[in-house]
Regions:
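Phosphate-group recognition and catalysis centered on beta-loop-alpha active-site segments
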Residues: 1-243
Length: 243
């Protein structure tokens, strides 16, 4: 039986469009990606917004920390211009904006909770409230490099699907994942081998890998049983993997 490996668009179709913007997410939907991976922060006034960094200067014409600004203040900045003049006018999206886009699809949403340099007290509760109220619990994966945040999510609701992100190798990650009830592992793709994927599957744990940007690597990972790859080039991998 052929292995079906899913393609998740990393911050949308981010190789072509400004990352984590609605134009990037719309492109991923139009391409037929199986899912979207994105990053969540909390504003000063408690709004769940989408951007990768804690500080906005890399991807906007503004400066400052997300945590120190209200949503209205963040709306003053342009989040498309850094990529190209033709994307001028893109604003920072909210989680609700993205959920609105995905509502009529069956796409998976992988939400990375940014809880590294900045801690957002209560972000787990706010995320669960939003995802539940919008009816997305069955197709959201919560991931984070802060595994305490994932354990907290599981403590709040065991039905939440969580996935620890990691870059360096973890010894027997399938056992580690079980310590807080993880449903998936999300390692850097060079940190896994076939035996790890096979053991994860035996224990009912999915393996989704980041960030895979060439079709040769994607084909290899498919051959060893990866469940999904997260990519900046969804169009390239969709054509390769599904051909």
């Amino acid at each position: 039986m052929e292995v079906i490996m899913r393609i998740y668009a990393h911050r949308g179709n981010s190789s072509v469009y400004p990352e984590n913007t609605m134009i990037s997410f719309r492109s991923a939907v139009e391409l037929g990606a199986d899912g979207i991976e994105t990053d969540i922060h909390l504003t000063k006034d408690g709004v769940l917004v989408i951007t990768h960094d804690e500080e906005i200067s890399r991807v906007s014409d503004g400066t400052g920390m997300v945590k120190d600004m209200t949503y209205v203040e963040l709306q003053k900045f342009d989040f498309g211009l850094w990529k190209d003049e033709k994307f001028k006018g893109e604003k920072i999206p909210t989680l609700d904006n993205l959920l609105d886009l995905l509502e009529g699809t069956e796409m998976v949403l992988n939400i990375e909770i940014k809880m590294g340099f900045v801690l957002y007290p209560g972000i787990e509760e706010k995320l669960l409230d939003t995802i539940k109220s919008r009816g997305f619990m069955d197709r959201v994966i919560f991931s984070s490099f802060n595994h305490y945040s994932l354990a907290r999510l599981k403590g709040l609701d065991m039905s939440a699907k969580v996935a620890p992100l990691y870059e360096e190798g973890i010894f027997e990650p399938y056992h580690y994942a079980r310590t807080f009830g993880a449903d998936y592992i999300h390692p850097y793709y060079k940190s896994v081998e076939q035996s790890i994927i096979e053991e994860c599957h035996k224990q009912g744990i999915g393996v989704n890998l980041w960030t895979v940007n060439d079709k040769e690597t994607a084909e290899y990972l498919k051959s060893i049983g990866a469940d999904a790859v997260i990519t900046d080039y969804p169009e390239v991998l969709i054509k390769s993997i599904r051909s």
